[in-house]
Amino acid sequence: FFINLIMNSNISHNIKKRTKANDVFITPLEIAKQQIQLHNINDNDLWLDPCRNNKEGSYFNNFPQNVRKDWCEILEGKDFFEYDENIDIICGNPPYSLMDKWIKKTLKLNPKEFSLLIGIGNLTTRRIEIIENAGYGLSKMKMLKIYDWYGMSCIVVFEKNKKSIIEYDRKVYKTKT
């Protein structure tokens, strides 16, 4: 068991040595379905899969039947960063290397709610504060482990005009030396 832990730590070393972001990770279907179910589902809402990645669309093809659907996929000429439709729900797995830009664009689109499947390390107090200052609260969070993905992942759902379920402190504390 201990040897496995040491060998698996090579993942983090390999990530540190990357010269180019490797942001294409297909969301397992079961996880996409779990993420979708965390949302409030209302008839005729417009849902967006911001990075469909392929025609199978783990998210897009599993959105509820009673909603309208749209998608973006840069490889198919529909860039999320150029999207400007009125949207109710954004649900997807963003590229981690573009997280700040992604959050900024999501907030600009002003959905009723949005969810992200992200690495637990991507959920920072600074990002939560930015999202809260835009009028959203963290309403749901689910931690999970996806095989071959680095570390723990989490699904976070933010809702407009909702109080966050967590508290945080942005003060940096120092230990005595």
Regions found by a protein language model. Name each.
Residues 2-177:
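Class I S-adenosyl-L-methionine-dependent methyltransferase catalytic core
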